[in-house]
Amino acid sequence: MLPRRAYANSVFINCPFDAAHRTLHYALVFAVYDCGSIPRSAQEVVDAGEVRIDKILRLIRESKFGIHDISLTEADTRTGLPRFNMPLELGLFLGAKAFGRGKQRQKGTLVLERRRYLYQRYCSDIAGQDIS
């Protein structure tokens, strides 16, 4: 049994897990720990039979804060397809804040993007957000 995690100290980290972005992922995990909080991500294994989207929804529900790196929405060089996992998870997090009840409405979000204002070209609905 895993230790009980406090909602107020849990930070959902939504960033790429591939080798090219491993340094960023480790830096985010370190920074969250260093601030006294608990990093949470889809890489957690509590139940290997849990469907991935259900795991993500559970982690969002259990986390007051979220860090979302949406910088990988460009087309993949091998497939030509964009990666929309990170914007999708950001949308789920923002939806939990907007439509949730009680503590869900207290969620705080940090959104990261590589180039300033690039997100407005592919995700204009968050154009009013402060993106770092």
Regions found by a protein language model. Give the residues of each.
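TIR-domain catalytic/interaction hotspot
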Residues: 44-90, 99
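Conserved N-terminal substructure of TIR/SEFIR domains
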Residues: 1-65
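Cross-kingdom TIR/SEFIR domain
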Residues: 77-132
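Generic detector of short, locally flexible boundary/turn motifs and exposed helical patches
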Residues: 4-8, 30-34, 73-79, 97-100
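Generic preference for flexible, low-structure residues
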Residues: 27-29, 55, 72, 76, ...
